[in-house]
Design a protein with these regions (language model features):
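Conserved ABC ATPase signature
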Residues: 1-3, 7
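Conserved catalytic motifs of ABC-family nucleotide-binding domains
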Residues: 20
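Catalytic Walker B motif of ABC-type/P-loop ATPase nucleotide-binding domains
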Residues: 24-27
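Helix N-cap at the start of a conserved alpha-helix in ABC-type nucleotide-binding domains
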Residues: 35-37
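Helical segment within the ABC ATPase nucleotide-binding domain
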Residues: 39-51
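H-loop/switch region of ABC-family ATPase nucleotide-binding domains
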Residues: 60-61
Length: 108
């Protein structure tokens, strides 16, 4: 096992793209990655979406990453949708509704 976590993620994305998908479902694609590898993965997903027209549904817990890379955010708390809209409309109240915590208590 000589591949890093980021390399494994890129291989996984490449394997999925070979199938010519209309959509990629990415569950925590940057979990356990260093910041540089996380940026590379998110840049790849954004490029795949914008260049190839493939919808990428990405499950993230990093609010800052979601705000930077998303065109649309769906926030869920206790299995219920509490937000569905563009990142630019996310407010501190919405973050509190999603995470049940004040924004100042979160790493953003």
């Amino acid at each position: 096992d000589q591949l890093s976590g980021g390399q494994k993620q890129r291989v996984g994305i490449a394997r999925a793209l070979i199938q010519n998908p209309k959509m990629l479902l990415c569950d925590e694609p940057i979990a356990s990655l260093d910041p540089n590898s996380a940026k590379i993965i998110m840049d790849h997903l954004k490029n795949i979406s914008s260049t190839l027209g493939i919808t990428c549904i990405v499950n993230l817990h990093q609010v800052d990453v979601a705000l930077k890379y998303s065109d649309r955010i769906i926030g869920i708390n206790n299995g219920k949708k509490v937000y569905d809209g563009p990142p630019k409309e996310i407010t501190e109240d919405i973050v509190r509704n999603i995470y049940g915590s004040e924004v100042k208590n979160l790493i953003l």
